[in-house]
Amino acid sequence: MVRQWWARAAAVAAVGALAAGCGRAPTPGLARGKALYDTCLPCHGAGGGGNQALGAPAIAGLPAWYVSAQLENFRAGRRGYAPFDTAGIRMKSISWSLDLEGDVPSVAEYVASLAPVNPAPVLAGDAAAGQAGFVACSACHGADGAGNETIHAPPLAGQSDWYLAAQLRKFRDGWRGTDTADVWGQTMRPNAMALDSAGMANVVAYIQTLRQAPR
């Protein structure tokens, strides 16, 4: 799987370098994003449903603004910097292959065009107890978990529960949200630190009751 990804990434980079060398940058947009998504496919899947074994979340249907922002965070080292964050480090390396102008917004546009998948829950938690804890989350992410672009709060509804739990732990443990340039990550970190392990499990269980509407 890893070798397959490197082969795909190398091919995408080679095509981009050739185009740049000829003075013809690829045209940004959905078609370009679909081609670039070949680099994402081995981990996130053709439909963007993710792969827990690889630490790859469901990304299908995420808003383009959020995908772009996180790709730029990985590219700049604001994510994937913790030495034991294997999935984050891998993602940071992948983001570096999107090095031509227009690459990031193009792949973000394609990801946003994919139909949300609403992965099935795999973790245990008390959703009723988590509803009370989610009140603090709803201030930014909304009561429906749909997110808020104005304050850079991503949608939570429809995301894999294991990924949400993993990100809360990363914020709590300083694997994410400690870079001074990651303003919105720094905003999130204190909220994660306020939750103990049971609280995280319960909030995540409640979020699983909020589902993305099909397109």
Predicted segment positions?
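His/Cys-centered metal/cofactor-coordination and adjacent catalytic loops
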Residues: 23-26, 49, 58-60, 109-121, ...
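An amphipathic alpha-helix signature
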Residues: 64, 68-76, 104-108, 112, ...
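C-terminal motif of bacterial Sec signal peptides marking the signal peptidase cleavage site
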Residues: 19-21
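The feature marks the first
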Residues: 30, 35-76
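Bacterial N-terminal signal peptides that target proteins for export
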Residues: 1-11
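Axial heme c-ligation environment in periplasmic c-type cytochrome domains
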Residues: 52-58, 74-104, 120-125, 150-155, ...
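Sequence/structural segment immediately N-terminal to covalent heme-attachment motifs in c-type
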Residues: 25-47, 122-146, 215
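Disulfide-stabilized extracellular ectodomain repeats and their linkers
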Residues: 37-40, 56, 64, 88, ...
